[in-house]
Regions:
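Conformational coupling and interaction surfaces
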Residues: 3-140
Length: 140
């Protein structure tokens, strides 16, 4: 209820990302300490994800958020009214969301909660391109 613009990036969105070993090699090819650190840090994580999640790489949750801040074409989303249940009882702490117009009574007053942009669809090739361009733009 702060009035701040909020974008929620749920796991449904971040699991649409994928970084493979081949991607990591290409993205971190420039000679700068930051991409080199990212390469060394992510290689074991990609291996772990391949073994445990049976994916061809790993998800890059935090990188998605930062890339989206740099280029909002990386992902799109939908606006929802969103809030957290604060009344005492079994549902306290539960989050809820709805889109207007709400067509049936669900015990939530109309226009309750804050308008929140919820990320839904990720353009993974563009995400990787934004990361690569950012790394390539680093000055030594």
């Amino acid at each position: 209820h702060s009035g701040a613009t909020i974008t929620l990036v749920p796991m449904d969105a971040t699991t649409q990302t994928l970084l493979t070993h081949q991607d990591l090699t290409r993205l971190t090819a420039c000679d700068h300490p930051l991409p080199q650190f990212v390469r060394e840090t992510l290689r074991p994580w990609i291996d772990y994800s391949i073994r445990t999640r049976h994916l061809p790489g790993c998800w890059i949750h935090d990188a998605l958020v930062i890339a989206w801040l740099l280029n909002q074409r990386v992902a799109d989303g939908v606006d929802y009214h969103d809030d957290i249940e604060l009344r005492p009882g079994a549902t306290r702490g539960k989050t809820w969301r709805y889109r207007t117009p709400l067509r049936l009574d669900v015990g939530v007053p109309a226009d309750a909660g804050a308008l929140v942009h919820v990320m839904q669809n990720v353009n993974n090739p563009l995400l990787l391109e934004v990361i690569e361009q950012t790394f390539n733009g680093l000055k030594r």
